Amino acid sequence: MQTLNAIKNADAKGDSFSSREFPMMDTDFDFIARMANEKTGIQLGKHKRDMIYSRIVRRIRSLNLQTFSEYCDYLKSHQNEEMTNFINAITTNLTSFFREEHHFDFLKDTVIPEIKSKNTVSKKLRVWSAGCSTGEEPYSLAMTFHSAFSDARGWDIKVLATDLDTNVVLHGKTGVYVQDRVDGLPASILKKNFNEVVPASGRGRAYEMSPHLKQYITFNRLNLLSDWPMKGKFDVIFCRNVVIYFNKDTQRILFDRYADMLKPNGYLFIGHSETLHGVTKRFESLGRTIYRKIS
């Protein structure tokens, strides 16, 4: 058993992680942080060590490895096979239906009436949920559009939902949510837009999105730092609680690319702790984390 002094000395050296079940040295964390930044743009500071430890440990166990150093070596030599698992492990997927409700109110009260008036000929609406996580955001968009366009015939409405994490993209495609993920929804919305199903665990309740909502959405994996295959432009882009993991230069590049992908006067919605101030001048602020492209 380590003495108290030994533990203090280890903490002082920054290598207290070396005494855990699966040792992780500073060099291991530095490699993981560097790889995360290279492949995804995500910045992992030292304060993220606990989080990274708990997430990568699952991969170490599944691969029957003994240390983080072994995992780092494995990742170096098996990048094609392991990189997707690595990225899935380090990404954060916190979301809920109608999160930041004022965004959906603005969409319903301001954006949709404007688009109905402006796109009378094409009758097209194109929206991108960038960083869609497990699908709550794009399905919230679909519910909003389905309700708002119920009296408007012939509209072609499509939501592109993308994320870096293949697991959450699959979850979104499936569209099944356990009870606690829908607890905040009014009973009327639940009844209108979900079908009760047997959860995979066989315990409790689960709800699947109705087919009339699934038809609006296309789920795809996409690394925001890679080339984008989309050809057409969007009326609205939601990119919320994504850029907080990027440095300022990466944020600027990303927001400028979003501006290029938006139609004239298109709308960008970002997360509550994010801002475009000091990052790009291609948008004007319309209120709390809501922006319009300057055309």
Which residues are covered by each model-predicted region?
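A short glycine-rich, Lys/Arg-flanked "PGG" loop and its adjoining helix->strand segment in the class I
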Residues: R252-P264
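Conserved SAM-binding loop of SAM-dependent methyltransferases across substrates and taxa
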Residues: T134-A152
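Conserved class I S-adenosyl-L-methionine
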Residues: K123-G135, K158-L160
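Class I S-adenosyl-L-methionine
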Residues: S273-S295
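Conserved AdoMet
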Residues: Q2-W128
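Conserved beta-strand signature within the Rossmann-like core of class I S-adenosyl-L-methionine
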Residues: N265-H272
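Extended basic-aromatic, gly/pro-enriched interface segments that bind polyanionic ligands
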Residues: D151, W155-F238, V242-F246, T250, ...
